[in-house]
Amino acid sequence: RFYDWEDNKMIEVLAPFINAGRLRVITIDSIDSETWSNKDYWDNRTKIERHECWYQYIIEELLPNVRQNPEQMFITTGASFGAFHAANFFFRRPDLFNGMLALSGIYYAAYGFGDYMDGLVYENSPQNFLQNMPKEHPYVDMYRQRKIVFCTGQGIGEQEALVSTREMDRILSEKAIPHWCDYWGSDINHDWHFWRRQMPYFIDKILMWR
């Protein structure tokens, strides 16, 4: 939810960047309980259509309203399933976003949809559509000009994120897309405590990255 970052002190660890005028943070509410995490009430097609409505709202309504000037840089970021959303927005619309920072994410749609696949699910599964994207696709050139950072630990709860991050690492490398996949140690678990360490570390580097 949109308040998770404040409740878990992510805003607090980013305060030095915010107070220095280097960073503005916009947290967006999700509807994951109705879509990706909804195992009981809706069929898969209804869930992905609902998700797509939310996605289009962010792209078509929210983003234009928060953009203060055409030169403003936007980077998507998130941890855990927020990392999936960050990657999904960025890789679907690199024309709108300047980069991405994804912590401990899983980047394929099977997380919420199991074996079900249709065109809309595919469009929301970065690991799938990037694998099949032709190297001459115009987005590939855009990716090469963007800031792409993945990080995952290798401790408790990070196994699926580790496998998925390694797969994204492989796909991007095969397409000669510059990126940084940082693998932290086996003492780094799937938890806010570690994301509070990672977030300012990477944000500082991204803001200095030219």
Where are these regions (language model features)?
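Non-catalytic cap/lid and distal C-terminal segments of serine-dependent acyl enzymes
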Residues: 1-210
